[in-house]
């Protein structure tokens, strides 16, 4: 069963809030901007990490220096999973913050 639009938006809101909280609780120097459903993380080296919602597809898209990734929400595991690799969103974010920010942050519940 696919996600309702309301549930989808609630889930993406929660992800973006959690991501912001992780960055707020670290000493990593980043600028955060959340506008129009798009969360942009700017690292001090000029690279960006962008989390954007794709409501028509009920997906969460992540753009990073290493590429673009599309995530579907899995109700069984209650996790966002990459539609190409099956990687958990939290694993990808940890890897990307290491690659782009030089610090592997923990995004455990994503």
Curated annotation (Swiss-Prot):
One Pfam short name: Frataxin_Cyay
A single BP term in Gene Ontology: iron-sulfur cluster assembly
Alphabetic keyword roster: Iron, Metal-binding
Gene Ontology MF term list: ferric iron binding; ferrous iron binding
Disulfide cross-links: none
One Gene Ontology CC term in the entry: cytosol
Function text: Involved in iron-sulfur (Fe-S) cluster assembly. May act as a regulator of Fe-S biogenesis.
Family the entry assigns: Belongs to the frataxin family.
HAMAP family, sorted: CyaY (MF_00142)
NCBIfam families in the record: FeS_CyaY
Protein's recorded name: Iron-sulfur cluster assembly protein CyaY
Origin species: Stutzerimonas stutzeri (strain A1501) (Pseudomonas stutzeri)
